[in-house]
UniProtKB/Swiss-Prot annotation:
It catalyses: 1-(5-phospho-beta-D-ribosyl)-5-[(5-phospho-beta-D-ribosylamino)methylideneamino]imidazole-4-carboxamide = 5-[(5-phospho-1-deoxy-D-ribulos-1-ylimino)methylamino]-1-(5-phospho-beta-D-ribosyl)imidazole-4-carboxamide. Pathway: Amino-acid biosynthesis; L-histidine biosynthesis; L-histidine from 5-phospho-alpha-D-ribose 1-diphosphate: step 4/9. Belongs to the HisA/HisF family. It is found in: Cytoplasm. Signal peptide: none annotated. This is 1-(5-phosphoribosyl)-5-[(5-phosphoribosylamino)methylideneamino] imidazole-4-carboxamide isomerase. Its main location: cytoplasm. Its EC number is 5.3.1.16.
């Protein structure tokens, strides 16, 4: 667990492009860049040392679909890269971690096959993140397309002793809409588990960063920032500065 909030700029990949979805809907994708590696390099030059990458096509297909773009990002961003999307077996985990990815995010497979997570966390300590994607407090799977009857806290409890490095909590109903991060639900999850929590979904502006940065001692490890950065309502350098200052405005 770091002392200050980790800012993860997000690069979501669809057919090799950098996009953002609204509420996880592939038909509501906005293209922001045709050069993912260049965008990753910009984030690094702005001061980011962590990056969150999602293979959106892979999330729906169940296997890697944007490998070339991810490889280019790895070369362009010398920091810590976290990757999710379609990682559903040990071969995929082995493959990505051997190609320079620092941490892999397991979502649907964690729900369907918890033993995979436990095996992977033993094999790769500090490199396995479990995605807890939820709508109205209930877990969603398969690219957010299917709703389960499992609560967020029940999902977290499954991995209490698995050795995962973090839980990535996404409020699907807010993702890509800039409605503001669901800090109440995120903090509730952090309070219910000893696993560090990464917040995602709906980050609107610096106010979300200030709030979350004040709760690193309460189990909040980081926050994923996507559309707000691309649309300009959140300045990455300012967010990084606020995170370093523990939520205090400069």
């Amino acid at each position: 667990m770091t002392d200050s909030l980790i800012i993860f700029p997000a690069i979501d990949l669809k057919e090799g492009h950098v996009v953002r979805l609204s509420e996880g809907d592939m038909d509501r994708a906005t293209i922001y860049d045709d050069d993912p590696a260049a965008r990753a390099r910009q984030f690094y030059e702005a001061g980011a040392r962590y990056l969150h990458v999602v293979d959106l096509d892979g999330a729906f297909a169940g296997h890697a679909m944007n490998a070339a773009a991810v490889d280019a990002i790895v070369k362009a961003f010398p920091g810590t890269i976290e990757l999710g999307g379609g990682i559903r077996d040990m071969n995929a985990i082995d493959g990505w971690l051997s190609r320079g990815i620092s941490r892999v995010v397991i979502g649907t497979a964690a729900f369907e096959n918890p033993d995979l997570v436990k095996e992977a966390a033993q094999k790769y300590p500090g490199q396995i993140v479990v995605a807890v994607d939820a709508r109205d407090g209930m877990v969603t799977t398969k690219g957010w397309a299917e709703q389960s009857e499992i609560s967020v806290t029940d999902m977290a409890e499954r991995f209490a002793d698995a050795g995962v490095v973090a839980l990535l909590y996404t409020d699907v109903g807010r993702d890509g809409l800039k409605k503001g991060c669901n800090s109440e639900a995120t903090l509730a999850l952090a309070a219910a588990t000893d696993i560090p929590v990464i917040a995602s979904g709906g980050v609107k502006d610096i106010g979300d960063i200030e709030l979350l940065a004040r709760h690193t001692k309460d189990g909040i490890e980081g926050v994923i920032c996507g559309r707000a950065i691309y649309d300009g309502s959140l300045d990455l350098k300012a967010a990084l500065a606020i995170a370093r200052q523990g939520g205090a405005s400069a």
